[in-house]
Design a protein with these regions (language model features):
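Metal-coordinating catalytic core of metallo-dependent amide/deamination hydrolases
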Residues: 135-274, 280
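His/Asp/Glu-enriched, well-ordered alpha-helical/loop segment
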Residues: 261-268, 310-394, 410-413
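N-terminal metal-binding scaffold of metallo-dependent hydrolase/deaminase domains
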Residues: 1-47, 58-59
């Protein structure tokens, strides 16, 4: 389970939004967890516990689950030279910075990026890391170490690129690898880190970067290896019209059709963005259980378009939520992303748009489904104790708590949550990270960032 046995009792929860199959909302209840698992929810529980919280006036929710990020981008946010670029030019410019990644940059960008997620109610993070400069060190191991330091549940990926500029791709030669190198390292990382057990704190997916930066052979071999090891598959797809035109010119087919020929559909696959799917492609996603991670802030910033989330939900396509990379968001708050998604889809029709509660379920149960997990994403007996608490007496929530299921999307929460709990352990206490020194970490991160950007 990742930690030694710990008992937690949260008393007097004003309202507990479970996001369970029955959409249950409990009032004035206690929650008891033992060894990271919820053992009881009910009034006036008499249970011994090492940690007891009084949650009177508190709203309680399942921990948010981030299903697409690029934590290494934390140190390339708000750069003036890329603010008015769209995806392809944006990537080409930033690769000249990212080619200098090392373990110090990855460690501190992971600590600060995941720390921000946790302070805003996130308890599980998936990161899509695909930039591996020669001689950079054990970048994925470094990410897992940072997650352990913070106490967050972590899904890393062995991303990859094998097409550089000389091959018709976008990245420089120094950050691409051969298919053989990638496959060997992928197997090593799965065998070293992937834990498929209940309550796992560490899992690994295989995640080639995108169809325009990897070869068909890399995609094919990644799918074969992932299924041999029973791990999941992830990549960017249908993010921009440029990608669609590139694939039509190179392969003579649309991106999803190309991916389907390589085995990249099914309930073990999820795509980031999925903006430009047509009607038939949405039906294929629904029929095969292939998922989509919605990243609205990034899609707006890069003028990529608006994913057809209302249509996906109607058809039964699995949908989760993600912040995307820190350089295209430019932040790491899934709470903010939840409200952004809610508002974005009301541009066309409030009647057709998903509700505030729909988006909460997308960010919890929906995201858990994309990661292939049924032990997180809702609050019920037998599930992992991943949750966050918000004091309903906050100034910004005055007059706003009549519908606790929707309030995170309709009104939003600007500052940090009061408590975040992962695996039955408090990881954010009174709005501050409980397991690291925030100021010291930020100070060290600024120094490393300045050196990194000054190269």
């Amino acid at each position: 389970m990742g930690f030694a046995m710990q008992r937690l009792l949260i008393r007097n929860i004003s309202k507990l939004v479970s996001c369970d199959e029955g959409d249950t909302v409990y009032e004035n209840v206690d929650l008891y967890a033992e060894d990271g698992v919820i053992r009881a929810i009910g009034p006036k529980l008499e249970k011994p516990a090492e940690e007891v919280l009084d949650a009177g006036h508190m709203l309680c929710y399942p921990g948010l689950i981030n299903t697409h990020h690029h934590l290494y981008q934390q140190f390339s946010r708000n750069l003036p030279q890329v603010q008015n670029m769209e995806l392809f030019d944006w990537l080409k410019t930033l690769y000249e910075i990212w080619k200098n990644l090392d373990t110090d940059v990855v460690r501190l960008s992971s600590l600060t990026g995941m720390g921000e997620l946790m302070k805003h109610g996130c308890t599980t993070c998936f990161d899509h890391h695909y930039v591996f400069p020669a001689g950079a060190g054990d970048l994925i191991g470094t990410q897992f170490e940072a997650a352990s330091e913070l106490g967050i549940r972590m899904h890393c990926s062995r991303g990859s690129m094998d097409l550089s500029v000389k091959d018709g791709g976008l990245p420089p030669d120094s950050v691409v690898q051969t298919v053989d190198e990638i496959m060997k390292d992928s197997a090593r990382l799965i065998e070293t880190y992937h834990d498929p057990s209940f309550g796992s704190m560490r899992q690994l997916a295989l995640a080639p970067c995108s169809p325009f930066s990897v070869s068909a052979e890399l995609l094919r071999q990644s799918a074969i290896l992932a299924r041999q090891y029973h791990v999941r598959l992830h990549t960017h797809l249908c993010e921009t019209k440029d990608e669609e035109n590139y694939m039509l010119a190179r392969e003579g087919m649309r991106p999803l059709a190309f991916m389907q020929t390589l085995g990249w559909v099914g309930p073990d696959v999820w795509y980031a963005h999925g903006i430009h799917f047509n009607d038939e492609e949405l039906k294929l996603l629904a029929e095969t259980g292939t998922g989509v991670c919605h990243c609205p802030a990034s899609n707006m910033k890069l003028a990529s378009g608006i994913a057809r989330i209302p249509d996906m939900l109607k058809l039964g396509v699995p949908v989760g939520l993600g912040v995307d990379g820190s350089a295209s968001n430019d932040g790491s708050s899934l709470m903010e992303e939840l409200r952004t998604a809610f508002l974005l889809h009301r541009l066309n029709s409030s009647r057709e748009a998903p509700s505030g509660y729909d988006f909460l379920k997308i960010a919890t149960r929906g995201s858990a489904r994309l990661l292939g997990r049924d032990d997180i994403g809702s609050l019920s007996v037998g599930r992992c104790c991943d949750l966050f608490l918000i004091d309903s007496r906050r100034l910004e929530l005055v007059g706003a708590c009549y519908d606790p299921k929707a309030v995170l999307a309709t009104v939003g929460v600007r500052g940090p949550v009061d408590y975040t709990v992962v695996n039955g352990r408090i990881t954010v206490r009174e709005g501050r990270l409980a397991r690291i020194d925030e100021e010291a970490t930020a100070r060290e991160a600024r120094m490393v960032c300045e050196k990194y950007l000054g190269q």
